[in-house]
């Protein structure tokens, strides 16, 4: 998402007029220049999607709220000692360029065409990386999914449904305060009802999300991307399973407010998953304080020659191999998934003919000779389903926990909004 934003003409680097504070956020501030820049980004992104661009006044409060929550997370990162090294940052920039089909020089040129300096882009990426790590520490690492939860999910009607249904969704969230009273709930209900009526009368969903939603994805038009049925609350999944594409739900009461969903696309179907496995054995010789790298290579060469001259591979492995997990079994690693092995070993194994011993080669562990004894494709559909279920349950818990945590840090923070015309109740 960040790479797309950087290359969508979404960043405005024009010289700003005299700056001023628009929000005090605990020990930091949000400046008018930051708000103006982000509003411009959002407007440019909407324009490139072909939508009508809302006026600046309609976006400012929504964008300011996002900047406040981002600022709080960056402050947590600072207090937690989270640092992004130049090497990590360069790697992230390279990945963004690669995903956009560009070299680093082409990426720099694209940024320049969009009015953004490379240094500004690096800072934007750095902020996103810090926020990601804060969320990993504060939210993701606390989430646990047991084997029993996975089994229960796969046995449930919802679990079975999730294997065949996937939805591309958008949402509009009208929130209520954490300790909402009846007046708060009625106010939110009136607002979501008004939004729903405008949608039924033909208002653009994305525009309404940008103008009204409190969800994290509001400025993307409420786009949630593809979600498995199992990632959604059961009632949502059942509702969507029979809902036509393009339709919206009525307002739904959820713990932190009201939500309206739009079903953008639907897809489904699951296939058997086949995994390649290789039956392989090897001899590992490691360098040590008493055996140099050159001597280790020479020993591996001598063992290779002895095998080629007819000596038994398994017996030599028992006598010489320094892999404690396989030496006593004649070097036999049994059936292995190539993806579980280091790249050099995997490449040698892929190129080896069955029954033919490879010449010695080096990995991080030492010098090897190997022999492929067989190849097969195994049905790993069940393991894939279990991994998919684990991912679904973790993602569902993460989404729920993240929204709760973001609301918590916002509620606990000292925030003073100084933007003229802002909703002071939002403080």
Curated annotation (Swiss-Prot):
Does ATP-binding count among this protein's keywords?
no
Q: Which domain of life is it from?
A: Bacteria
Keywords in alphabetical order, please: Chaperone, Isomerase, Periplasm, Repeat, Rotamase, Signal
Q: Which Pfam families match?
A: Rotamase, Rotamase_3, SurA_N
Tell me where in or outside the cell this protein is found: Periplasm
**PpiC domain mapped to chain residues:** 164-265, 275-374
Q: Does the keyword Amino-acid biosynthesis apply?
A: no
Major localisation: periplasm
Q: Which reaction does it catalyse?
A: [protein]-peptidylproline (omega=180) = [protein]-peptidylproline (omega=0)
Write one Gene Ontology MF term.
peptide binding
Q: Where is the signal peptide?
A: 1-13
For this entry, list what GO says about its biological process.
Answer: Gram-negative-bacterium-type cell outer membrane assembly; protein folding; protein stabilization
Give EC number(s), comma-separated. 5.2.1.8
One Gene Ontology term, aspect cellular component: outer membrane-bounded periplasmic space
Record remark on domains: The PPIase activity resides only in the second parvulin domain. The N-terminal region and the C-terminal tail are necessary and sufficient for the chaperone activity of SurA. The PPIase activity is dispensable for SurA to function as a chaperone. The N-terminal region and the C-terminal tail are also required for porin recognition.
**Summary of the function given for this chain in its UniProt record:** Chaperone involved in the correct folding and assembly of outer membrane proteins. Recognizes specific patterns of aromatic residues and the orientation of their side chains, which are found more frequently in integral outer membrane proteins. May act in both early periplasmic and late outer membrane-associated steps of protein maturation.
Which PANTHER family does this entry report, sorted A to Z?
Answer: CHAPERONE SURA
What is the protein named?
Chaperone SurA
Annotated organism of origin: Pseudomonas putida (strain ATCC 47054 / DSM 6125 / CFBP 8728 / NCIMB 11950 / KT2440)
């Amino acid at each position: 998402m960040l790479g797309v934003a950087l290359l969508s003409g979404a960043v405005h680097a024009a010289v700003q007029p005299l700056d001023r504070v628009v929000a005090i956020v605990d020990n930091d501030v949000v400046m008018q220049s930051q708000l103006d820049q982000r509003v411009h980004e959002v407007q440019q992104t909407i324009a490139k999607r072909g939508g009508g661009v809302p006026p600046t006044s309609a976006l400012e409060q929504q964008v300011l709220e996002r900047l406040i929550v981002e600022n709080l997370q960056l402050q947590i990162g600072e207090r937690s000692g989270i640092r992004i090294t130049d090497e990590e940052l360069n790697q992230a920039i390279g990945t963004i360029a690669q995903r956009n089909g560009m070299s680093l020089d082409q990426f720099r040129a694209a940024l320049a065409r969009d009015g953004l300096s490379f240094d500004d882009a690096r800072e934007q990426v750095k902020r996103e990386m810090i926020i990601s790590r804060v969320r990993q520490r504060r939210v993701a690492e606390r989430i646990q999914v047991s084997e029993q939860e996975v089994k229960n999910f796969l046995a449930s009607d919802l679990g079975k449904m999730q294997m065949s249904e996937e939805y591309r969704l958008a949402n509009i969230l009208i929130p209520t305060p954490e300790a909402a009273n009846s007046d708060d709930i009625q106010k939110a209900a009136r607002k979501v009802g008004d939004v729903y009526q405008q949608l039924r009368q033909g208002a653009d969903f994305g525009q309404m999300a940008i103008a009204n939603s409190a969800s994290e994805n509001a400025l993307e038009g409420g786009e949630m991307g593809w979600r498995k049925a199992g990632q959604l609350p059961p009632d949502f999944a059942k509702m969507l399973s029979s809902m036509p594409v393009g339709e919206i739900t009525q307002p739904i009461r959820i713990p932190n407010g009201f939500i309206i969903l739009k079903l953008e696309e639907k897809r489904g179907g699951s296939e058997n998953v086949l995994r390649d496995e290789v039956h392989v054995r090897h001899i590992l010789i490691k360098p040590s304080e008493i055996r140099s790298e050159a001597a280790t290579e020479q020993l591996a060469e001598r063992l290779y020659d002895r095998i080629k001259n007819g000596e038994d591979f398994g017996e030599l492995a028992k006598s010489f191999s320094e892999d404690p997990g396989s030496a006593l079994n004649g070097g036999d690693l049994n059936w292995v998934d190539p993806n579980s092995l280091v790249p050099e070993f995997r490449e040698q194994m892929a190129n080896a003919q069955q029954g033919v011993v490879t010449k010695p080669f080096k990995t991080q562990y030492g010098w090897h000779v190997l022999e492929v004894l067989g190849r097969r494709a195994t049905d790993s559909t069940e393991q894939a389903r279990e991994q998919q279920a684990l991912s679904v349950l973790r993602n569902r818990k993460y989404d729920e926990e993240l929204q709760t945590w973001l609301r918590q840090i916002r509620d606990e923070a000292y925030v003073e909004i100084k933007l003229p015309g802002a909703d002071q109740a939002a403080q």
